[in-house]
């Protein structure tokens, strides 16, 4: 019964909509002439600007696109590094962690087992993402000025 009531309501709506005038059911395309007028006005503006620009200098209108230069890094990815102990202990990286006064950092960061995973230039300077080989810890972003380049990886698995 509910289905038959719904069908009868739909059929009554269709008879009401068919009795309405056509102009109220369909929206006329009033915006179409406005777009053509705007396009014609823009063409006129461009033609007047083209004449004035053509008289001034045609080379000034064509400017080559310059791509941003790639930054030059002091290190490269995959390079083996170690952290300079004195610079690290006096840095904001060490002081912001809140270590106790007697704590002098983890020994493995001062050994030749750090690998540069990524390099970025931030507002505060050039930083390297350093991961330590054989140490199950997360990599850390450290300033490149406190890193010392090493020739080879000095690491013995225990």
UniProtKB/Swiss-Prot annotation:
Q: Where is the transit peptide?
A: 1-38
Q: What happens when the gene is disrupted?
A: Malfunction of the NDH complex.
Subcellular location per the Swiss-Prot or TrEMBL entry: Plastid, Chloroplast thylakoid membrane
Any GO CC annotation of this UniProt entry = mitochondrion
Alphabetized GO MF terms: oxidoreductase activity, acting on NAD(P)H, quinone or similar compound as acceptor; quinone binding
Record-stated family: Belongs to the NDH complex subunit O family.
Q: What does this protein do?
A: NDH shuttles electrons from NAD(P)H:plastoquinone, via FMN and iron-sulfur (Fe-S) centers, to quinones in the photosynthetic chain and possibly in a chloroplast respiratory chain. The immediate electron acceptor for the enzyme in this species is believed to be plastoquinone. Couples the redox reaction to proton translocation, and thus conserves the redox energy in a proton gradient.
- Quaternary state and interactors: Part of the chloroplast NDH complex, composed of a mixture of chloroplast and nucleus encoded subunits. Component of the NDH subcomplex A, at least composed of ndhH, ndhI, ndhJ, ndhK, ndhL, ndhM, ndhN and ndhO.
Give the protein's recorded name.
NAD(P)H-quinone oxidoreductase subunit O, chloroplastic
Q: Which gene encodes it?
A: ndhO
């Amino acid at each position: 019964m509910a289905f038959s009531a719904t069908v009868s309501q739909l059929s009554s709506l269709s008879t009401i909509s068919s009795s309405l005038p056509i102009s109220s059911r369909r929206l006329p395309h009033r915006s179409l002439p406005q777009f053509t007028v705007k396009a014609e006005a823009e063409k006129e503006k461009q033609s007047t600007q083209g004449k004035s620009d053509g008289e001034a200098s045609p080379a000034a209108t064509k400017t080559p696109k310059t791509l941003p230069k790639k930054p030059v890094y002091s290190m490269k990815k995959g390079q083996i590094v170690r952290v300079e102990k004195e610079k690290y202990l006096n840095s904001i990286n060490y002081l912001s962690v809140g270590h106790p006064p007697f704590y002098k950092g983890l020994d493995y960061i001062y050994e030749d087992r750090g690998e540069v995973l990524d390099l970025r230039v931030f507002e505060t300077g050039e930083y390297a993402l350093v991961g330590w080989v054989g140490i199950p810890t997360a990599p850390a972003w450290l300033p490149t000025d406190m890193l010392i380049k090493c020739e080879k990886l000095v690491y013995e698995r225990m």
